[in-house]
């Protein structure tokens, strides 16, 4: 990477926050100020995701030849400059994506508008998690001729019987697998702090998502004076499954499905400050989510 790559990325952020947003309405409700606030928050906050584009150029300049790119598909922001860079600098290559998450009805980024697929950066082939998702992703607007039914490559480690993970884990415990959203993390941690007073014997482990703002998370933990925990960032999520007694989640993560598949006690918690992106919402899963600290306490009991 060169200095010019970083300067161009900063310029991209500056252009992003200067895109005019006016007269954005939901029926008669003006949402322009809300969209502007999000625009200012995101303009420079996600610049690191753009660096993959010039990185691909540097790889091309260095003489690399790449026939195929493989990546985990969630239709998130970092995937767009990645696909654009692949097609720009390695036009003869194929981009193959494998589905890495569930599809949530309330997460608009997982759906394409009418004819949006004609210009939206999309992989050449998307390996779906089974035949059901052929219809799910097709109905979400993705080109049906690019969808292929296949195995869920994320779950291959579910069949592993052994692990080299040897961290000394305190028991009994609860694990909080945080997602990409700081607000969801704050809601979960604040409720768990209250609940932990009722169960002092349960040790708390927090697993941070790589897209979280760690500095802001640390500030929140200090603000609420929550310090009796350890981070569970070491090892894979599958490593922690065999060392965890209870998992608590505010949604927005396929870890919920993995937890159920492994037979680990799971408590789904509806957040008070965001949408509840629950991958089990469309299933007949018999245990309903909870919301308040009192409900969580009853669920733990």
Which ranges hold each PLM region?
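Structural motif
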Residues: 1, 67-68, 71-75, 125, 129-131, 173, 177-181, 203, ...
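Active-site-proximal region of nucleotide-activated glycan assembly enzymes
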Residues: 1-2, 40-47, 51-54, 61-149, ...
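Conserved N-terminal ligand/cofactor-binding loop architecture of enzyme catalytic domains
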Residues: 1-53
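A short acidic (Asp/Glu
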Residues: 77-85, 106-111, 136-140, 159-161, ...
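Catalytic binding pocket for nucleotide-activated donors in carbohydrate/polymer assembly enzymes
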Residues: 138-149, 224, 246, 251-301
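Conserved catalytic-core segment of nucleotide-activated headgroup transferases in glycan assembly
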Residues: 139, 148-222, 230-231, 290
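Short acidic alpha-helix that forms the nucleotide-activated donor recognition element
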Residues: 234-244, 261
